[in-house]
Amino acid sequence: MLNPLSRWLLPLLIGNLSILTCVAQTSTAADSEALQIYQDHCAGCHGAQRTGAMGPALLPESLARLRKAEALNVMLHGRVLTQMPAFARQIPEEKLQRLIELIYSPPAEPPRWEEKDITQSRVSYPVPDNDKPLFSADPQNLFIVVELGDHSATLLDGDKFEAITRFKTRFALHGGPKFSPDGRYVYFASRDGWISKYDIYNMTYLAEIRVGINTRNLAISADGQYLIAANYLPGNLVLLSSKDLSLIKIIPASSGDTTSRVSAVYTAPPRHSFVAALKDIAEVWEITPSDTD
């Protein structure tokens, strides 16, 4: 037999349970709808797993510096000088808000980017048959100015501070350009894992490769033969040949059963090595390219 307090509490608990069930069902339906919108309108450019394709990755790590309000504005009105369309007339704003919540949330399964993905992503462009600069400026006194807003870079004459050329880059370059020892080539890393090699003399790209889903920075060896990228996702270091950006080795960032993101990697010229800082393990690593085999 129920006491008076139980008679009062039981209906209240049942009512609250019903409300929670309805909320959960509504949330699930909203999530499913957002997933469907993503598959219908976004997956073609940003990848079925949100890891990026023609467009950038849409994952929390990749969107860390983009506020949700800015992301919504891009969805509504598109992005100038890109293939990002405006959806204001196709999709109600409240549904785009759900899509925003989706892309700023971790996926159910962590995305993978493995050796096969890296090697298949590599693109080579025609190599110009010219070893002299196509400009009159001093090739040893140049600047590369990275423009974050519209994902472009400018080659600047260091004597006159005048632009020599301006060219498009991958989405959200990060970590600063890295120059070859002779100053002819510059290498870029984007937040969504693209490494690009640019021939300054001929003002053209030579090769690109995607080494990860979220990349922190890039370093070039003192002799100019190697590049190494530090990745948050997946947590590893990726060693490349600077000649053609071909993959040499993937170095997982792990110690025992613990894995880590890689915060940064830098060149140690006197030691002919690289030094990497791990974020989730209290360790600093030294990597000697000649010993990676």
Regions of interest found by a model, annotated:
Residues 162-168, 204-209, 246-255:
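A short beta-strand motif characteristic of beta-propeller blades
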Residues 158-160, 199-203, 242-245, 289-292:
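Short loop/turn segments that connect beta-strands within beta-propeller blades
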Residues 138-139, 181-182, 222-223, 269-270:
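Residue-level detector of Asp-centered blade-edge/turn motifs that repeat once per structural unit
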Residues 20-37:
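Electrostatic cytochrome c docking/interface patches
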Residues 44, 49-53, 59-108:
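Extracytoplasmic electron-transfer domains, predominantly the class I c-type cytochrome c fold
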Residues 125-126, 130-132, 173-178, 214-220, ...:
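Repeated scaffold domains used in trafficking and secretory/extracellular systems
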Residues 243-293:
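Solenoidal tandem-repeat scaffolds enriched in leucines and small polar residues
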